[in-house]
Curated annotation (Swiss-Prot):
Entry-linked PANTHER family: SUPPRESSION OF TUMORIGENICITY 7, SUPPRESSOR OF TUMORIGENICITY 7 PROTEIN
Any matching Pfam family: ST7
Protein location: Membrane
Family: Belongs to the ST7 family.
Membrane-spanning intervals of the chain: 19-39, 469-489, 496-516
Membrane topology classification: Multi-pass membrane protein
Cellular component, GO, one term: membrane
Disordered: annotated span: 66-85
Signal peptide limits: none
Species, as recorded: Macaca fascicularis
Modification type Phosphoserine: residues: S343
Keyword Phosphoprotein: yes
Biased composition (Low complexity): 66-80
Lineage: Eukaryota, Metazoa, Chordata, Craniata, Vertebrata
Name of the protein in question: Suppressor of tumorigenicity 7 protein
Length: 534
């Protein structure tokens, strides 16, 4: 025992200050690299790498989780409803107010050099186009067969070329000989029906202005309306005709909706409202396009608040899916009744009136549904062009809503002031939003990951609830700073730090030496001698 202690003391005495400098410097470097990796992993995936490895891999090895236990199966059965709800809330929806690629998105790229749409977003749009604009019988018509391939094409120029090719095929005239007299014949010219989906693609992607897009959509409307009427008469003749009629219906609804949006962009708002109302009456079951959200935005532009309230009364129902447009428009109407006279100082003195309480509750309801919107309405975060798809309750939906509705909030005097004074009070009602909500289901945890796929990389995705730094990042940062400080002090004051290091090690081993001395005093010397030899 005494030999071991003396050899340890000799080893410590032979260590030079350079050794301590090298030791602390190496420790600081390693902990710094770990810190950088942990921070990068946390920013990209939202969790600590060390914590994830510990929970996912080390804990099962240490026996912390029993995968075969009955408790696990019971808990999984009990959580099935919440899991299904989480999956439904993380569904990606088509943005009803999406912009035009050629006339709006591409112009932004030409000016800034940035791509406003992600590959994931455009791929979802390609899938939507194949679902809405194609059917199994397209191979029977050459133009539709070309367009079926065009919707799958990734290269924009290749898609545009395919659309022109489809239109050129339809320009081919079939000539039929009709004998009039034995010595002469004439040719009857017969035009093939136009390809409506080709005009749609050109209007969306090739037209560089809204006016050009509107002209192409009007040509698409002529072709699409004819195809719709023909397939409507034949839809009961078999499943193939029924699928073709369903496709033609989707094409016609899409064209009319985009024409209404063109009219809205060009300032013909009343005309746009009429087109949207007619479309909703003609096709009341096609709720997938969410045309009522386009109608709400146009009515707000006209300041027709009574009509807005009538639309909300129909669609702001407990049985229907909610959206930021529904919730925040309802809050705007409630705020409009009191916002011009609202004062935080007066409200704190006399309390809130019934109308003010209703407005505050409507704002809290809207903020609970989508907590990202107020930062854009209050211009605490800069807006970008909205994506073609949104995630309800996510940052993408907040951008899409604020991009079109910020002007409507500014137009109502005092509405933004009321929002500024009350929106943060929502979070006091739901301290644990991922576990339990107040008026809605708990906030889905999948929004951040999906929004990072939908939104461009130059945009900083808004995260809710704000994540705290994991313990391992804080621990690594402290360890890195501490070892770096030790290395610096050892380099500047080598002799003094050597004395401190020896004193620290002596203090560290003092309890062990005390225990060993007690053991030596209790055990016989002969037995202790035998144990040390072993």
């Amino acid at each position: 025992m005494f030999g071991t202690e003396s050899s340890l003391s000799m080893f410590l005495n032979t260590l030079t200050p350079k050794f301590y400098v090298a030791l602390t410097g190496t420790s600081s470097l390693i902990s710094g690299l770990i810190l950088i990796f942990e921070w990068w992993y946390f920013r990209k995936y939202g969790t600590s790498f060390i914590e994830q490895v510990s929970v996912s891999h080390l804990r099962p090895l240490l026996g912390g989780v029993d995968n075969n236990s009955s408790n696990n199966s019971n808990s999984s059965n009990g959580d099935s409803d919440s899991n299904r709800q989480s999956v439904s809330e993380c569904k990606v929806w088509r943005n009803p107010l999406n912009l035009f690629r050629g006339a709006e998105y591409n112009r932004y790229t030409w000016v800034t050099g940035r791509e406003p749409l992600t590959y994931y977003d455009m791929n979802l749009s390609a899938q939507d186009h194949q679902t809405f604009f194609t059917c199994d019988s397209d191979h029977l018509r050459p133009a539709d067969a070309i367009m079926q391939k065009a919707w799958r094409e990734r290269n924009p120029q290749a898609r545009i070329s395919a659309a022109h090719e489809a239109l050129e095929i339809n320009e081919i005239r079939s000539r039929v000989e009709v004998p009039l007299i034995a010595s002469s014949t004439i040719w009857e010219i017969k035009l093939l029906p136009k390809c409506a989906t080709a005009y749609i693609l050109l209007a969306e992607e090739e037209a560089t202005t809204i006016a050009e897009a509107e002209k192409l959509f009007k040509q698409a409307l002529k072709a699409g309306d004819g195809c719709y009427r023909r397939s409507q008469q034949l839809q009961h003749h078999g499943s193939q005709y029924e699928a073709q009629h369903r496709r033609d219906t989707n094409v016609l609804v899409y064209i009319k909706r985009r024409l209404a949006m063109c009219a809205r962009r060009l300032g013909r708002t009343r005309e746009a409202v009429k087109m949207m109302r007619d479309l909703m009456k003609e096709f009341p079951l096609l709720s997938m396009f969410n045309i009522h959200e386009n109608l709400l935005e146009a009515l707000l532009e006209l300041q027709a608040y009574a009509d807005v309230q009538a639309v909300l009364a129909k669609y702001d129902d407990i049985s229907l899916p909610k959206s930021a447009t529904i919730c925040y428009t309802a809050a705007l109407l409630k705020a409009r009744a009191v916002s011009d006279k609202f004062s935080p100082e007066a409200a704190s003195r006399r309390g809130l009136s019934t109308a003010e309480m209703n407005a505050v509750e409507a704002i809290h309801r809207a903020v609970e549904f989508n907590p990202h919107v107020p930062k854009y309405l209050l211009e605490m975060k800069s807006l970008i062009l909205p994506p073609e798809h949104i995630l309800k309750r996510g940052d993408s939906e907040a951008i899409a809503y604020a991009f079109f509705h910020l002007a409507h909030w500014k137009r109502v005097e005092g509405a933004l002031n009321l929002l500024h004074c009350t929106w943060e009070g929502t979070f006091r009602m739901i301290p644990y939003p991922l576990e339990k909500g107040h008026l809605f289901y708990p906030y889905p945890i999948c929004t951040e990951t999906a929004d990072r796929e939908l939104l461009p990389s130059f945009h900083e995705v808004s995260v809710y609830p704000k994540k705290e730094l994991p313990f391992f990042i804080l621990f690594t940062a402290g360890l890195c700073s501490f070892t770096a400080m030790l290395a610096l002090l050892t380099h500047q004051f080598p002799e003094l730090m050597g004395v401190f290091a020896k004193a620290f090690l002596s203090t560290l081993f003092a309890p062990l030496n005390f225990v060993m001395e007690k053991v030596e005093s209790i055990l016989p010397s002969s037995l202790w001698h035998q144990l040390t030899r072993i």
